Every structure is written in C-alpha cells, then in structure tokens.
Amino acid sequence: IAMAKVSTSGVEFIELGYLKPTDIVEPNFELQVGRAKNVCLGMILEGYRAPRPPRLWALGETPRAAFEAAIWGMKEAGFASEHDMLIATKLAYIITGGDRIEGTPITEQDLLDLECEAFCSLCGTEKTQQRIQHMLTTGKPLRN
C-alpha cells in the first residue's frame, strides 16, 4: 500500500500489468458504459460462460505474520505511515483467509466478505475518509 503505483489511464493500467494488452480500454468517460454494454451483449451472443470458481485455500497465520513483519519494517523505515500500516494489516488478514486455519478451503465470496468487512471498518476512520475525498477531488492518492 505504501509503495503502490497508481494508474492514471487505461493504457498505463495495461503497462503496469493489471490488464492484458488485449483488454478493451475506453478512454472517453462518456462512452464507457455504452461500450461495456456492447461488449457484454457480444459475449452473450458468442455463448460466453463464466469460468468455474477457482479452488482456494486459506494461507493462515504464518504467512500473515510474515506480511505483518514486512509491513512493520516498512513503517519503521519510513516508507509507510501508521494508516498505511493499518490498511496493509487488514489486507494481509484478507488475503490469508482471515482467522481460518492454513489449508482450509475458502471461496471467493469468503474473501469478498472479509474485504467488505475491512473496507467498512476503514471507512469509519477519518484518515480513510480524507483519502477517499482527496482521490475523488484530485484523482491522486493522499499519503496521510
């Protein structure tokens, strides 16, 4: 989180590896919804079916402790703020499966539920509210 690179365009999003070069990018904001709708309708006509949900297993406490140690190290080295540390700790909790034991099967929905819980918790903090407001008004991340 503290070192995250934020994309400022669809092309840059592809360059950062978040999208495939074959993914569609519509730079015109006013055309995005219509273009997305047309892509979806085309996929339906071509017989698209969603892939099967992946099989996932919780990573558990040991990897989470490693993530938390790295997060603490970044804060101590001055690369992350207290709030960055709070967010990153919540992310570590999510991606390791919460309180589940290592190897326990976990679904995408379980991970989404953990993410929703963490996001709602963070939205109750003044610093998260400041970050959201700053991003909405400037388009740039706030490091507070």
Predicted features, each with a name:
Residues 3-5, 9, 15, 21-144:
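Intrinsically disordered, low-complexity segments enriched in small/flexible residues
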